[in-house]
Protein backbone atom coordinates (compact mmCIF):
# COMPACT_ATOMS: atom_id res chain seq x y z
CA UNK A 1 0.00 0.00 0.00
CA UNK A 2 1.52 3.30 -1.14
CA UNK A 3 -0.46 5.63 1.14
CA UNK A 4 2.28 5.95 3.78
CA UNK A 5 5.15 4.70 1.61
CA UNK A 6 7.37 7.71 2.37
CA UNK A 7 7.15 7.13 6.11
CA UNK A 8 7.56 3.38 5.80
CA UNK A 9 10.62 3.75 3.57
CA UNK A 10 12.40 6.20 5.86
CA UNK A 11 11.72 4.91 9.38
CA UNK A 12 8.70 2.66 9.82
CA UNK A 13 9.06 2.19 13.59
CA UNK A 14 9.41 5.82 14.72
CA UNK A 15 6.23 7.27 16.31
CA UNK A 16 4.33 9.22 13.67
CA UNK A 17 1.20 9.89 15.70
CA UNK A 18 1.24 10.47 19.45
CA UNK A 19 -2.00 10.82 21.36
CA UNK A 20 -2.44 12.50 24.73
CA UNK A 21 -5.85 12.08 26.35
CA UNK A 22 -5.58 14.12 29.52
CA UNK A 23 -9.03 13.05 30.72
CA UNK A 24 -8.03 9.39 30.88
CA UNK A 25 -4.32 9.97 31.39
CA UNK A 26 -3.49 7.86 28.34
CA UNK A 27 -0.52 8.47 26.07
CA UNK A 28 -0.28 6.34 22.94
CA UNK A 29 2.28 6.14 20.14
CA UNK A 30 1.57 4.93 16.62
CA UNK A 31 4.45 4.11 14.30
CA UNK A 32 4.28 4.26 10.54
CA UNK A 33 3.72 0.51 10.45
CA UNK A 34 0.89 0.74 12.97
CA UNK A 35 -0.83 3.56 11.09
CA UNK A 36 -0.46 1.61 7.85
CA UNK A 37 -2.04 -1.44 9.48
CA UNK A 38 -4.96 0.58 10.83
CA UNK A 39 -5.49 2.27 7.46
CA UNK A 40 -5.64 -1.15 5.80
CA UNK A 41 -8.10 -2.51 8.36
CA UNK A 42 -10.41 0.47 7.95
CA UNK A 43 -10.15 0.38 4.15
CA UNK A 44 -11.06 -3.31 4.12
CA UNK A 45 -13.96 -2.65 6.49
CA UNK A 46 -15.30 0.19 4.35
CA UNK A 47 -15.32 -1.95 1.22
CA UNK A 48 -16.21 -5.39 2.57
CA UNK A 49 -18.43 -4.60 5.55
CA UNK A 50 -20.06 -1.39 4.35
CA UNK A 51 -19.93 -1.99 0.58
CA UNK A 52 -18.62 1.49 -0.18
CA UNK A 53 -17.07 2.64 -3.45
CA UNK A 54 -15.40 5.69 -4.95
CA UNK A 55 -18.73 7.46 -5.37
CA UNK A 56 -19.63 6.99 -1.69
CA UNK A 57 -19.09 9.51 1.09
CA UNK A 58 -18.24 8.97 4.74
CA UNK A 59 -18.56 11.50 7.52
CA UNK A 60 -16.16 11.43 10.47
CA UNK A 61 -18.06 12.99 13.36
CA UNK A 62 -15.44 12.19 15.99
CA UNK A 63 -13.48 14.21 18.51
CA UNK A 64 -9.76 14.69 17.87
CA UNK A 65 -7.94 11.43 18.41
CA UNK A 66 -6.16 8.52 16.83
CA UNK A 67 -9.37 6.78 15.77
CA UNK A 68 -10.44 9.78 13.68
CA UNK A 69 -7.02 9.70 12.00
CA UNK A 70 -7.25 5.94 11.39
CA UNK A 71 -10.68 6.23 9.78
CA UNK A 72 -9.51 9.09 7.57
CA UNK A 73 -6.42 7.20 6.42
CA UNK A 74 -8.49 4.11 5.71
CA UNK A 75 -10.95 6.09 3.62
CA UNK A 76 -8.12 7.66 1.64
CA UNK A 77 -6.55 4.25 1.06
CA UNK A 78 -9.88 3.01 -0.30
CA UNK A 79 -10.26 6.21 -2.36
CA UNK A 80 -13.53 7.08 -0.63
CA UNK A 81 -14.30 10.79 -0.15
CA UNK A 82 -14.45 12.15 3.39
CA UNK A 83 -16.31 14.95 5.08
CA UNK A 84 -16.21 15.97 8.71
CA UNK A 85 -19.16 16.70 10.99
CA UNK A 86 -21.78 16.33 8.23
CA UNK A 87 -23.44 12.97 8.84
CA UNK A 88 -26.70 13.89 7.10
CA UNK A 89 -25.06 13.96 3.65
CA UNK A 90 -23.00 10.79 4.02
CA UNK A 91 -23.44 7.13 3.18
CA UNK A 92 -21.72 6.13 6.41
CA UNK A 93 -21.36 8.24 9.55
CA UNK A 94 -18.68 7.50 12.14
CA UNK A 95 -20.11 8.97 15.33
CA UNK A 96 -18.65 9.19 18.83
CA UNK A 97 -20.53 7.18 21.43
CA UNK A 98 -20.60 9.90 24.07
CA UNK A 99 -20.25 13.20 22.23
CA UNK A 100 -22.88 12.51 19.58
CA UNK A 101 -25.19 9.94 21.14
CA UNK A 102 -28.33 11.89 20.29
CA UNK A 103 -27.24 12.36 16.68
CA UNK A 104 -26.42 8.67 16.36
CA UNK A 105 -29.79 7.64 17.80
CA UNK A 106 -31.65 9.98 15.47
CA UNK A 107 -29.73 8.68 12.48
CA UNK A 108 -30.38 5.05 13.36
CA UNK A 109 -34.07 5.73 13.97
CA UNK A 110 -34.34 7.55 10.64
CA UNK A 111 -32.78 4.60 8.85
CA UNK A 112 -35.03 2.09 10.59
CA UNK A 113 -38.28 3.96 10.07
CA UNK A 114 -37.63 5.56 6.73
CA UNK A 115 -39.08 8.75 8.13
CA UNK A 116 -35.90 10.77 8.17
CA UNK A 117 -33.45 12.01 5.58
CA UNK A 118 -30.56 9.84 6.69
CA UNK A 119 -30.44 6.39 5.10
CA UNK A 120 -26.81 5.39 5.60
CA UNK A 121 -24.98 3.24 8.10
CA UNK A 122 -23.96 4.48 11.54
CA UNK A 123 -20.67 3.32 13.03
CA UNK A 124 -20.29 4.05 16.73
CA UNK A 125 -16.77 4.79 18.00
CA UNK A 126 -16.06 4.87 21.73
CA UNK A 127 -13.67 7.27 23.41
CA UNK A 128 -11.72 4.35 24.84
CA UNK A 129 -8.04 5.19 24.29
CA UNK A 130 -7.29 1.60 23.28
CA UNK A 131 -10.10 1.38 20.75
CA UNK A 132 -12.37 -1.07 22.54
CA UNK A 133 -15.96 -1.22 21.36
CA UNK A 134 -19.21 -0.09 22.92
CA UNK A 135 -20.13 -3.41 24.46
CA UNK A 136 -16.53 -4.18 25.38
CA UNK A 137 -16.51 -1.08 27.57
CA UNK A 138 -19.83 -1.88 29.21
CA UNK A 139 -22.13 0.14 26.97
CA UNK A 140 -25.19 -0.82 24.96
CA UNK A 141 -25.00 -0.62 21.18
CA UNK A 142 -27.84 1.24 19.51
CA UNK A 143 -30.07 -1.03 17.40
CA UNK A 144 -28.94 -0.99 13.80
CA UNK A 145 -25.57 0.60 14.52
CA UNK A 146 -22.15 -0.95 13.92
CA UNK A 147 -19.64 -1.22 16.76
CA UNK A 148 -16.38 0.07 15.29
CA UNK A 149 -13.84 -1.52 17.65
CA UNK A 150 -14.64 -5.22 17.33
CA UNK A 151 -15.74 -4.86 13.71
CA UNK A 152 -12.59 -3.26 12.34
CA UNK A 153 -10.33 -5.68 14.22
CA UNK A 154 -11.84 -8.53 12.20
CA UNK A 155 -10.30 -7.20 8.98
CA UNK A 156 -6.78 -7.80 7.72
CA UNK A 157 -3.96 -5.32 8.07
CA UNK A 158 -3.00 -5.59 4.40
CA UNK A 159 -4.95 -3.76 1.68
CA UNK A 160 -4.60 -5.33 -1.75
CA UNK A 161 -5.97 -2.56 -3.94
CA UNK A 162 -3.72 0.16 -5.43
CA UNK A 163 -3.53 3.34 -3.38
CA UNK A 164 -2.24 6.83 -3.97
CA UNK A 165 0.48 8.30 -1.80
CA UNK A 166 -0.58 10.63 0.97
CA UNK A 167 1.62 13.33 -0.55
CA UNK A 168 -0.28 13.15 -3.85
CA UNK A 169 -3.61 13.29 -2.03
CA UNK A 170 -2.58 16.32 0.03
CA UNK A 171 -1.16 18.01 -3.07
CA UNK A 172 -4.56 17.79 -4.73
CA UNK A 173 -6.33 19.35 -1.74
CA UNK A 174 -3.83 21.82 -0.25
CA UNK A 175 -0.67 21.86 -2.37
CA UNK A 176 0.86 24.76 -0.47
CA UNK A 177 0.73 22.85 2.81
CA UNK A 178 3.30 20.30 1.67
CA UNK A 179 6.00 22.96 1.55
CA UNK A 180 5.38 23.98 5.15
CA UNK A 181 6.60 20.72 6.68
CA UNK A 182 9.61 18.44 6.44
CA UNK A 183 10.66 15.02 7.76
CA UNK A 184 11.87 16.76 10.93
CA UNK A 185 8.51 18.41 11.61
CA UNK A 186 6.72 17.32 14.77
CA UNK A 187 3.56 19.35 15.20
CA UNK A 188 1.18 19.67 18.13
CA UNK A 189 -2.54 20.01 17.43
CA UNK A 190 -5.58 20.08 19.68
CA UNK A 191 -8.26 19.66 17.06
CA UNK A 192 -9.61 20.63 13.66
CA UNK A 193 -12.73 22.35 12.39
CA UNK A 194 -13.27 20.82 8.95
CA UNK A 195 -11.67 18.55 6.37
CA UNK A 196 -9.27 21.16 4.99
CA UNK A 197 -8.16 21.99 8.51
CA UNK A 198 -7.56 18.29 9.16
CA UNK A 199 -5.53 17.97 5.98
CA UNK A 200 -3.43 21.00 6.90
CA UNK A 201 -2.80 19.98 10.51
CA UNK A 202 -2.55 16.20 10.37
CA UNK A 203 -2.22 14.82 6.86
CA UNK A 204 0.26 17.38 5.53
CA UNK A 205 2.89 16.79 8.24
CA UNK A 206 2.54 13.02 7.77
CA UNK A 207 2.76 13.38 4.00
CA UNK A 208 6.01 15.30 4.41
CA UNK A 209 7.45 12.46 6.48
CA UNK A 210 6.97 14.23 9.80
CA UNK A 211 4.88 13.40 12.84
CA UNK A 212 1.88 14.71 14.76
CA UNK A 213 1.05 14.99 18.45
CA UNK A 214 -2.65 15.30 19.35
CA UNK A 215 -3.47 16.59 22.82
CA UNK A 216 -7.03 16.61 24.13
CA UNK A 217 -8.73 17.03 27.47
CA UNK A 218 -10.80 19.32 29.64
CA UNK A 219 -9.30 22.82 30.05
CA UNK A 220 -8.69 22.23 33.74
CA UNK A 221 -6.49 19.27 32.82
CA UNK A 222 -5.00 20.43 29.53
CA UNK A 223 -3.72 23.74 30.87
CA UNK A 224 -1.25 26.02 29.07
CA UNK A 225 1.41 24.77 31.45
CA UNK A 226 0.60 21.16 30.59
CA UNK A 227 0.75 21.94 26.88
CA UNK A 228 4.16 23.54 27.36
CA UNK A 229 5.28 20.38 29.14
CA UNK A 230 4.02 18.20 26.28
CA UNK A 231 5.93 20.38 23.82
CA UNK A 232 9.12 19.81 25.80
CA UNK A 233 8.58 16.08 26.30
CA UNK A 234 7.72 15.41 22.67
CA UNK A 235 10.26 17.82 21.17
CA UNK A 236 7.52 19.55 19.23
CA UNK A 237 8.78 21.79 16.43
CA UNK A 238 5.53 23.69 15.86
CA UNK A 239 2.22 24.25 17.62
CA UNK A 240 -0.71 24.65 15.27
CA UNK A 241 -3.76 26.64 16.41
Segments from the language model and where they lie:
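Conserved AMP-binding/adenylation subdomain of ANL enzymes
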Residues: 174-184, 194-240
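ANL superfamily adenylate-forming
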Residues: 92-182, 232-241
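Residue-level marker for well-ordered alpha-helical positions
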Residues: 2, 40, 69, 199-200, ...
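Flexible, charged surface loops at secondary-structure boundaries
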Residues: 10-11, 51-54, 84-91, 115-119, ...
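Short beta-strand->loop structural element characteristic of the AMP-binding/adenylate-forming
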Residues: 60-61, 68, 72-102, 109, ...
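Conserved AMP-binding/adenylate-forming
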Residues: 45-81, 85-87, 182-204
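A short N-terminal helical cap/helix-turn-helix that marks the beginning
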Residues: 1-18
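Conserved AMP-binding/adenylate-forming core of the ANL superfamily
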Residues: 18-52, 153-181
Amino acid sequence: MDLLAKILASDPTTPRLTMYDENSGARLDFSGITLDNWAAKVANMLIEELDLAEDSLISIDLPPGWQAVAVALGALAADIPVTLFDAATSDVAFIAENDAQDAAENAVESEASGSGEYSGDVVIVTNDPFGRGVEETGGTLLPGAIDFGPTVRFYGDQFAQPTRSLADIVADVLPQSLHRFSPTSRVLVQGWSNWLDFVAKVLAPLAAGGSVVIATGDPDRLTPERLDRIVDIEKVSERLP
